[in-house]
């Protein structure tokens, strides 16, 4: 049985898939296997096959903040957007979100429930898994500020890790030092707020972001880290870049 046939037992598999189809910057060569696992159990089986065949892999979110080489990647890309993309709101304002969830969709649904905490995220075109990996944020807020814990697949075992175990800082998490760990679920604590105020703030911040980073144009997203003294965007504008 071929590697593709083995993988297709547990996933949808695209061979020689152009990465430019899967990044917001619309660049990237082809990858040998682009994989959509059917569920969490299937993901574990896919990872086992890749390990047995010594196939390198990356887990990709929605392709923002990613620069892919034009050189073909002889390995696999695993995408969780199609199957691990559910989220739930508990009565006390806890949001439980799988790794493939859209950050924008989560922010909108939180607003509909008058829950505050994700207004800054209404224009960020990433997934919750990618957001937790790099601690996505904007307007002096970020995911870690609202995080309770993360469900992680590591060493073929699923476990929950509390926020204080995850070494969160500005655009940093422990996951960047453990690239063999796979983020499955995040849990966040949101608070009750005024729906009109939440909506107005989301609208203004989304409009500001879309004016600089339109979603309908090839764009890598906000890729520069902010120095402490002055925002990166201000430096770029003053330099005329």
Predicted ranges, named:
Residues 14-15, 21-23, 66, 153-241:
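Phosphate/pyrophosphate- and phosphate-bearing ligand-binding catalytic cores of soluble enzymes
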Residues 28-29, 35-40, 67-85, 133-163, ...:
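Structural signature of FAD isoalloxazine-binding scaffolds in flavoprotein oxidoreductases
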Residues 110, 128, 132, 136, ...:
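Short, well-ordered alpha-helical segments in soluble proteins
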Residues 36, 79, 116-129, 180-190, ...:
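Short flexible/disordered coil segments
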Residues 2-128:
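Anion-binding (especially nucleotide phosphate/pyrophosphate-binding) glycine-rich loop
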Residues 65-66, 107-110, 118-122, 135-142, ...:
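A generic local secondary-structure boundary/capping motif
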Residues 43-47, 107, 147, 199-202, ...:
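A generic alpha-helix structural signal
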Residues 43, 99, 103, 143, ...:
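Generic structural signal for well-ordered, non-membrane alpha-helical segments
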